Amino acid sequence: MSTDKTNQSWGGRFSEPVDAFVARFTASVTFDQRLYRHDIMGSIAHATMLAKVGVLTDAERDSIIDGLKTIQGEIEAGQFDWRVDLEDVHMNIEARLTDRIGVTGKKLHTGRSRNDQVATDIRLWLRDEIDLILSEITRLQKGLLEQAEREAASIMPGFTHLQTAQPVTFGHHMLAWFEMLSRDYERLVDCRKRTNRMPLGSAALAGTTYPIDREYTAQLLGFDAVGGNSLDNVSDRDFAIEFCSAASIAMMHLSRFSEELVLWTSAQFQFIDLPDRFCTGSSIMPQKKNPDVPELVRGKTGRVFGALMGLLTLMKGQPLAYNKDNQEDKEPLFDAADTLRDSLRAFADMIPAIKPKHAIMREAALRGFSTATDLADYLVRRGLPFRDCHEIVGHAVKYGVDTGKDLAEMSLEELRQFSDQIEQDVFAVLTLEGSVNARDHIGGTAPAQVKAAVVRGQALIASR
């Protein structure tokens, strides 16, 4: 006869129930219930394996699997009663299974611990989340390629130090973000490889005495391999940290992009127009059209950075193997994945709808002596050392500042006062078109190179 006074699956060793506040404090079911689908997936594979090796009968396996599928239906229909006193998603599902099918439900946990169970659940969940995020990155990149192809020759100022530097094209600028997102994609693909290793079968920390077949279970669950050390398998959260690191870099890219969009929509720049559906107004100022989507993405970046630091701090002092600290791994991981996925979705919807204001961008590119480097390069081709050319053009720019003239607005006589090597053909390189067309190499801003880069980008996406 049971003498359990705790009403818990582990209560045999205890003589009094857990304090009510402690039960609530230590429970995780309020947030880990989102793992239910992956918990059930892992349990079905585990039961299938146990029957294969003879620990369960085929009838017991079938009863367990049918019960788990019914429970999944209850959860998805909103008919499942999540109980805090049962601590977590695992025990809630197991208790409901036992209620439905009787003592056979208690056999499911044979050869398994919640330590390897939760580690498996998180990896299964994160694997799916990475796939969703990769899909959103691809969708955003397609939008960037659309803009780059459409605006391959649309001239705008390029900046360093937020000062006018050299003319570029809007399409070239869009491709810069495409490149960053390609690296984000690669990082997440690499992260998925290390995530897709199965800890199940490690039990609490040392393995199990049952004749389990871990490779078979891994095959059922779509894992690439099984984890090689039971101690490491149950305590490893590197994959979650690595994901949050990759997510942080991706959010940093989106935050930088957001900053540019906020600047470009301002009255001081007016480079682009965002459709109304991506903006909001002011409760007091009737004229306002605020770029809330990029502003909010910029703000949400801090949440993902915080998740990374939270997980690093969580793990830094833990001895092997599993510790209750690891219950705190889920909320930051969940939040980082949700935030990145939603931010990418917002950008993927918004970017194709951006409308550049060509005349304003072109006018801005004409200000700030953006073709000064082209004049220096022109003189280099005339045989002068670059440093001498740099100084000559610096004097010409100073003259332009004093007289209010851009280099292209000066007469040949005015330009020749700085170097007698300057001839009439200089004006071909001082135009905006001449400047961008001259940068005709892989990675350059020439419209022909932008179009070629779009083709390469399309091929990259098609290869995924």
UniProtKB/Swiss-Prot annotation:
Q: Which domain of life is it from?
A: Bacteria
Q: Where are the transmembrane segments?
A: none
Reaction catalysed by this chain?
2-(N(omega)-L-arginino)succinate = fumarate + L-arginine
List GO molecular-function terms, semicolon-separated. Answer: argininosuccinate lyase activity
Annotated family: Belongs to the lyase 1 family. Argininosuccinate lyase subfamily.
* Annotated PANTHER family: ARGININOSUCCINATE LYASE
* Entry protein name: Argininosuccinate lyase 2
